[in-house]
Amino acid sequence: MTNIHTDKILILDFGAQYTQLIARRIREIGVYCEIWAWDHDPSEIAGFGAKGIILSGGPESTTSPGAPVAPQEVFDSGLPVFGICYGMQTLAAQLGGATEAADQREFGHAEVDVVAADALFSGLTDHAGASRLNVWMSHGDHVSQVPPGFTITATTDRIPVAAMSNEAKRWYGVQFHPEVTHTLQGQTLLRRFVVDVCGCQTLWTAANIIEDQIARVREQVGDDEVILGLSGGVDSSVVAALLHKAIGDKLTCVFVDTGLLRWQEGDQVMAMFAEHMGVKVIRVNAADRYFAKLEGVSDPEAKRKIIGNLFVEIFDEESNKLANAKWLAQGTIYPDVIESAGSKTGKAHVIKSHHNVGGLPEHMKLGLVEPLRELFKDEVRRLGVELGLPRTMVYRHPFPGPGLGVRILGEVKREYAELLAKADAIFIDELRKADLYDKTSQAFAVFLPVKSVGVVGDARAYEWVIALRAVETIDFMTAHWAHLPYDFLGTVSNRIINELRGVSRVVYDISGKPPATIEWE
């Protein structure tokens, strides 16, 4: 079997918003990589066995006291090193060059002039011209003097060093962001570093990952039984399909129907996994328990905790009935692992705690099986398609863990959840009919707990308000509201008001992120 982890790249993260994008681009090339904090234990960096190291961008200034630096072991390793943005600046500063703060930040599109050919830039062209490349900049500081042994390979009208290299040492740096699609030749630059300079084979493919994970799961669990909390979401669905392929009927899935799922989602999950794929699925109808626990609770964080804790409680009850189960499978994915890792210095902040990472009751003496923990979401989707799951399921828009519980503002009631699920289904149905679903990154309805005056027949009526939300985004860190056609919005509004008793008004959310978040709670 192919060892897909032999050739790998290590990315040291200095806190840039684009770091995960670097990793995703390298994975797309077909090479495995991991993201570690810049201050990770140097001995572990040496022991990782990378074929090359990338230094990411970051928000700090190399001119500030205590600015993050790459461990000296990186430069002593003899490995190729590629610094991006802040990564190039610290590369220069640490190796005897100089950096300085610019009078003003450079952010957005720029053109760089290639002035010397090296392994990355040789023969590279795009429509900006033979020696001019369209790139994406996002920086304040810049390199003012390259270190000894380095050559300037690219410049711009505003900065003297847009790229530099020391070919003898195989050290490279660029001030711009090759991982961003606006840098037209960015993927080619990354491929040249990873494949040509570092010598990595492109073994990281969906088929190879499935083969690798099946072997790992079989080795890990042996003849033991495994249980999985199946939510209907992409991650747990792909885990179910993968484990079923690996261990067959030794897998039992527990599907907790909270009453806060998408319209008819419970029936769809059972049809797909239990009936179509032959997976053992226990369905727990727990809506009554959820609505009882959520009664009178309006604080969003309190709702999240109640929903999460009750899921664990119910799952615990069901797992106790499965005496032979020794392993718990989870849909943890790589961003969960990164965000929960943090940094020993506190320079990299723990963004949030994840229900998939460290959220299990301590008395649950089950081993963990996490076959997706090395994968980004786009890779999980590709695996799902490779495993035979329907594209409509695998490429569905994101759905929050607490479900409709955080799309109902304020207190959650059964009648609100039923209205919202139906309104949401109408919105999604119309998006698909108009061929707009795949053109939006996320679209959903929100229940507003306010009554607005309307006219029903000849009478005034005070009824509920539904908000529609649709956004376009690449990474979900920033998002634009989707400019859906007025006629389309009118059709959706008419259907919701006409088909749902109790709704008299539909509004459309035109807030971007930032300042708004994508979800309302």
Curated annotation (Swiss-Prot):
Q: Enzyme class, one word?
A: ligase
* Pfam families hit by this protein: GATase, GMP_synt_C, NAD_synthase
Q: Which GO terms describe its molecular function?
A: ATP binding; GMP synthase activity
InterPro entries, A to Z: Class_I_gatase-like, GATASE, GMP_synth_C, GMP_synth_GATase, GMP_synthase, GMPS_ATP_PPase_dom, NAD/GMP_synthase, Rossmann-like_a/b/a_fold
**Active site (UniProt):** C85, H177, E179
Gene3D superfamilies, per this entry? 3.30.300.10, 3.40.50.880, HUPs (3.40.50.620)
* Keywords noted in UniProt: ATP-binding, Glutamine amidotransferase, GMP biosynthesis, Ligase, Nucleotide-binding, Purine biosynthesis
What's its job?
Catalyzes the synthesis of GMP from XMP.
Please describe the quaternary structure of this protein: Homodimer.
What is the protein name for this chain? GMP synthase [glutamine-hydrolyzing]
Protein source organism: Xanthomonas euvesicatoria pv. vesicatoria (strain 85-10) (Xanthomonas campestris pv. vesicatoria)
